[in-house]
UniProtKB/Swiss-Prot annotation:
Probably part of an ABC transporter complex that could be involved in peptide import. Probably responsible for energy coupling to the transport system. It comes from Brucella abortus (strain 2308). GO terms for cellular component: plasma membrane. It is an enzyme of class 7 (translocase). This is Putative peptide import ATP-binding protein BAB2_1053.
Length: 334
């Protein structure tokens, strides 16, 4: 067995009996920005000791403001970025921090990534049937006839006519292009899709269609999703559990219904209160202040400078992630 990936044969089961197929423990990602003028290295910690789990057949929504580290976590989970320290386990296999491509190869089929911008994700000179077949060509285990049949199957699966296979990306709408990207991600029958702002570039009606498609695919194929988004309404529509990220740290996780109806962390509550209401005249809260610089975070709780409930201890002591019923929350109020 490779010295950069070791097998861990524990069977991770949640209390509800569902297998945990993704686990991160104290996951850290640092970016070295070079030398400080006064000496030493300038290091930006984009992800700070993040612990998450994803169970088989569920969707974990990952929310937070821009720059909170959401996309960085997603890219580490599919091997697009190495992690600095901590632990990643996929299907019971531990991924070493600087694992090479060869170490990731057995997992490539099982974990796929859906990018935010479907236009940028598709080669404009490549017919969409060829684009969808790219993973099949890399795997190289199908005949030409089998490859063509699989492309047709994938296009039907995402709601596109098979006759569209010979068209080019510019001939499609944004929503149709995202369906093509999803079809390509499904080519090798993955078990997990990491969806990084997968509907952010679409209008509201197209967003609803893609969300419904993802839910239908989950029901049909038993997929698990890490659904990364800043739009809380979309996350609510698609997720079973939600994790709230702030300045690279998890501040709260829990079942969708509980977290949306009664958020425990002040940041979770402020984030939900900032969402515009459909009712005319409904009050809307704005989170005061700015997200702290990841190069100079507060000594204690990262949210302390913006928190209306901050106490003295918050300024000096980082709050641990505590289990509160069916949730975890990092706050000195609990």
């Amino acid at each position: 067995m490779s010295d950069v990936m070791t097998a861990n044969r524990r069977s991770f089961l949640a209390e509800d009996g569902k297998e945990t197929i993704v686990r991160t423990d104290d996951l850290v990602r640092d970016f070295d920005l070079g030398h400080r003028p006064e000496g030493g290295r300038l290091v930006l910690r984009a992800v700070d000791k993040v612990s998450l789990t994803i169970r088989r057949g569920e969707t974990l929504g990952l929310v937070g403001e821009s720059g909170s580290g959401k996309s960085t976590i997603g890219r580490m989970l599919v091997g697009l970025l190495p992690y600095t320290s901590g632990n990643i386990e996929l299907f019971g296999q531990k991924i070493e921090p600087r694992a090479k491509a060869a170490a990731w190869k057995p997992l490539r089929r099982r974990v796929q990534f859906v990018f935010q911008d479907p236009h940028a994700a598709l080669n404009p000179r490549m017919r969409v049937g060829t684009a969808i077949a790219e993973p099949l060509d890399v795997a190289g285990n199908l005949t030409r006839k089998e490859r063509s049949a699989r492309v047709d199957e994938l296009m039907e699966l995402v709601g596109l006519p098979t006759s569209f296979a010979r068209r080019f990306p510019h001939e499609f709408s944004g929503g149709q292009r995202q369906r093509i990207v999803i079809a390509r991600a499904l080519a090798l029958n993955p078990e997990i899709l990491v969806c990084d702002e997968a509907v952010a570039s679409l209008d509201v009606s197209m967003q609803a269609q893609i969300v419904n498609l993802l839910k239908d695919l989950q029901d049909q194929l038993g997929l698990s999703y890490l659904f990364i988004a800043h739009d809380l309404a979309v996350v609510r529509a698609v997720s079973h559990r939600v994790a709230v990220l702030y300045a690279g740290q998890i501040v709260e996780t829990g079942p969708r219904t509980a977290l949306y109806s009664d958020p425990l962390h002040p940041y979770s509550r402020a984030l939900l209160d900032s969402v515009p209401r459909a009712r005319r005249g409904a009050p809307r809260s704005i989170i005061a202040g700015e997200v702290p610089s990841l190069l100079n975070k507060p000594k204690g709780c990262a949210f302390c400078p913006r928190c209306p409930k901050a106490m003295d201890i918050c300024r000096d002591v980082p709050p641990p992630l505590r289990v509160i019923g069916d949730r975890e929350v990092a706050c000195h109020l609990y």
